[in-house]
Amino acid sequence: MKNKFVELVEKSQIRTDLPEFNPGDSITVNLWIKEGDKQRIQAFKGFVLRKRNRGLHSAFTVRKMSSGMGVERTFQTHSPLIDSITVEKRADVRRAKLYYMRGLTGKAARIKEKV
């Protein structure tokens, strides 16, 4: 059981401007990157490998292919470093965690699109 003060602080920090997405969906995450004294937005485009719903501590992992190598990055859903999330394609998958996609290449790595 959490303290009421902790719940109040967590509730105020939860973001409501982010779209709903599920594992398998192709998304673009725009996040703020700080390099020295400059700030810019960098896009990370891939599909959602897993999603963890834990209130303020929610997180999701996005996987993309970069120069033939698989790159995975885990984001905190309610992080202030995330500028925006856009859903490119919705997927029709039957699993909550798509870890099996790590070992697939080529046509086998395709995900069926939801119509």
Curated annotation (Swiss-Prot):
MF terms in GO: structural constituent of ribosome
Keyword Ribosomal protein: yes
GO cellular component, one term: cytosolic large ribosomal subunit
Keyword Transport annotated: no
Key words of the record: Ribonucleoprotein, Ribosomal protein
GO terms under biological process: translation
Protein family: Belongs to the bacterial ribosomal protein bL19 family.
Role: This protein is located at the 30S-50S ribosomal subunit interface and may play a role in the structure and function of the aminoacyl-tRNA binding site.
Protein name: Large ribosomal subunit protein bL19
Protein source organism: Francisella philomiragia subsp. philomiragia (strain ATCC 25017 / CCUG 19701 / FSC 153 / O#319-036)
